[in-house]
Amino acid sequence: MDRMQHHFDSAPSKVKSHKSPMAGFDDEFTDIVDYILRITYRIWEGKQIGLCYDYYSDDCPVYTMSGITIGAEEVTQNTLSTLASFPDRTLQAENVVWGGNDIDGYHTSHLIKTSMTNLGGSDMGPATNMETTFLVIAHCIVKDNKIIEEWLVRDNYALAEELGFDVHQVAREKAAIPIQQRLKDWNQSELNRVQKSVTHERQPFLGCSSNDSEGFIKALLQNIWNARLLGDVFQSYSDDALLHCSRNQTLKGREEIAAFYAQIIGTVTQLKFSHDYCCSIPNDNGGKDVAVRWTITGNHGCAGLYGEPTGTPLLILGESQFRIIDGLIAEEWTIFDELSILVQIYRARLSIAE
């Protein structure tokens, strides 16, 4: 089926192939990476927004920490709204890590560097005419040529800051708006799920000599986040490892990376970390790129990153990619919506004030 016949299509058709079977997909797609890259380009750079009707199912949930959409119609409207605020938006694909298959559904972790200019009003405020570049990771489940479920995280803290807004003022204003019922229900179900399923049990170190890259990453995350063994950073990352994270920060070296984990764990008391999906592909350096979608729950129990503690329960949806070279993590991308954490905290402060 040629969906683009008689329609404008500038999407690149030649991409690095991973040779994945594509039963149920349009013949034009050579593999799942080609599918993700081409449909993303067509919708955003090609401005063929109506293709969301073709590539999203009618009941597809898209989970973000600012709200949940259901189905192709809402995805289409959200895309149009974004382009009204940022008409020149581009999405540069940094990597696509994938797992699954064409029978049960593919999972894709799409790391994106997005650039855009704020030429129209947005949910953060009036147009500022400022340019911004920040990171996004979208985890999609794709089956029979359609995205059937998606978890989307973007660095909204960096977005607000680069547009010239006071991030805390934006968070206060968002906190004053009644929370979407879908989001409220999902937040509570996720808090319950993670609290019941996660333990502080330690995992054996699966480092340099292991061929199980996914097991290595899952064990490391369990030990750092849940067992509080932050020192495992020093045996799992290379000396000059890079961590790209919230607020458009790039941290370098084991000390800075360990401090990143310490600040979050120290601020979010009773923290529990759930790795919800993991997959990997070979990289060009003879190692593996590993993607993880994860969830953190806990309480705002210490001042740390976010000021006077409120004790409010916190939910953090995050996605990461790890580049493993010679058995060590050489580079990491960990993205979560830090603005949404502030919104949860300010919502609690408003409730206390009432």
Where are these regions (language model features)?
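C-terminal and inter-domain tail/linker signature
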Residues: M1-E354
